[in-house]
Amino acid sequence: MFDFASYHRAATLADAINLLADNPQAKLLAGGTDVLIQLHHHNDRYRHIVDIHNLAELRGITLAEDGSLRIGSATTFTQLIEDSITQRHLPALCAAASSIAGPQIRNVATYGGNICNGATSADSATPTLIYDAKLEIHSPRGVRFVPINGFHTGPGKVSLEHDEILVAFHFPPQPKEHVGSAHFKYAMRDAMDISTIGCAAHCRLDNGNFSELRLAFGVAAPTPIRCQHAEQTAQNAPLNLQTLEAISESVLQDVAPRSSWRASKEFRLHLIQTMTKKVISEAVAAAGGKLQ
């Protein structure tokens, strides 16, 4: 039995915001895959709970007429994987969701929880970065929209105040032609394991050149990151193996991995360069291009 000091089930989003404001120690419970572990270990910081699991305002995937997408923060990873909209418009996000844990976890774990947990290994963070998502955040002070790039502020930390709730992810319209994206995860096991290194890439091609490249890595720095030096190297560069090699060298200026029991810093640097080539090659192929 969990040792709750207080438990409140929010009836609406407004109710949840008020409950958070009235309970400064409260933690949100959506999927529960992180919070319940803390409760199991009797973490005193998780004894006050506001349950938002059943809030309709936090769920659903919608496509607007202009091609922009909205994904509710409490949407589960299984829902992301199975939805035709995300399959068509955000394939790297679907691939990342498919790499998370196992079916039982994906059935309950939420997209928003994975991002707000703040872990650099969060598998959904890198595709969210390459698709330039904005986060819709509600609080007693109103609504604000912030870019995903910069939302992670340190290990286990995000730019979210206690009385704020991440309500939805908003994705800008994606070009329909000559674009491709991919996600790749390296872990010690094929399933039920967190990333040793994770990455995602999105590219737009134009007449045999990189018109744009977006590259993101997880577990390559204290937070999930976009790789600015690598992206600049690709800008308007020819679509060939020499450019790919140059990008894999430039990416070393963007990353700062550490050694841990999972992998040494040196091995992670090797993985980063190797995975840069792999994920970009897959994104180029998805865009209909070929590296010569």
From Swiss-Prot:
GO biological process per UniProt: hypoxanthine catabolic process; purine ribonucleoside salvage
SMART domains: CO_deh_flav_C
Keyword presence, Transmembrane helix: no
PROSITE patterns reported in the protein's UniProt record: FAD_PCMH
InterPro entries (UniProt xref): CO_DH_flav_C, CO_DH_flav_C_dom_sf, Diverse_Substr_Oxidored, FAD-bd_PCMH, FAD-bd_PCMH-like_sf, FAD-bd_PCMH_sub1, FAD-bd_PCMH_sub2, Mopterin_DH_FAD-bd
Keywords from the named record: FAD, Flavoprotein, NAD, Oxidoreductase, Purine metabolism, Purine salvage
Cofactor section: FAD
EC number: 1.17.1.4
Name of the top EC class for this enzyme: oxidoreductase
A GO term from the CC aspect: xanthine dehydrogenase complex
PANTHER family: XANTHINE DEHYDROGENASE FAD-BINDING SUBUNIT XDHB-RELATED, XANTHINE DEHYDROGENASE SUBUNIT C-RELATED
Protein name as it appears in the record: Xanthine dehydrogenase FAD-binding subunit
Organism in which the protein naturally occurs: Escherichia coli O157:H7
